[in-house]
């Protein structure tokens, strides 16, 4: 099986320094490496990981690139490329191509509702830099992975209509249920994105939605709606590990890696064995590893 979304970092600050402004006290844990995750995940059958660039490394992808190079076929990466910046840097599409050569094959974009205000209007993707990223994603089969909330859906819908060939991922079930309830209008809006054939959804981060208590059964209704709309071929399971983050009440124990897996593997009885194989392995394998 494949975990399509984990965060990792090292405590070797000399070799992999934190970005300016960050210090070791900012880290959720002293370290959280791919090896740490795999020690927990492999006994459960989860043997491959998508490493999502951690905030405190900024734009320096050295750590995940090094991990991927040391673990070919086991690790793959999602990076960060700024589409809009006030400093002189590479064109975002050129940066995407360069990073893809290091095994970083998806690129995270934060939605307007999921980041600090930048002074942009409702069409927050209306910028030549984002056009370049969408175009490059189509031409190179590099996914754009969106950390968004439901209010961001209309703008993403507009861009997916403009660039229908670009692979797009919605992280964390679009944040639905993060405030407790699972509003029908938000679920319908997310499911409406299924009209775009290259839009996929990461199903997970169950610790952060609904009652926020394992076994997370209150998330099953949302999972069912999303899988029915997108099909299991466009859904992939994630944990968003680490699941324990000191200072964050929503991620304190008893959240466990196995509980996140068990919701799909054991409790989603509306899914067939084939559906579960696609969600837990095949969708992520096809997008990230079968290149």
Model feature map: region roles:
Residues 1-2, 6-9, 123, 133, ...:
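A generic "structured core" feature
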Residues 1-59, 258:
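An N-terminally biased module of ancient metal coordination in phosphate/nucleic-acid-related enzymes
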Residues 2-6, 49-52, 76-79, 107-109, ...:
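Hydrophobic faces of well-ordered beta-strands that scaffold small-molecule active sites
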Residues 30-40, 86-99, 185-186:
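Short, acidic/polar
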Residues 58-151, 158, 200-206, 212-213:
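Active-site gating/metal-coordination segments in enzymes
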Residues 59-74, 160-169, 222-228, 252-267:
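Short, electropositive alpha-helical surface patch
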Residues 177-179, 183-291:
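H/E-rich (His + Asp/Glu) clusters that bind or coordinate divalent metals
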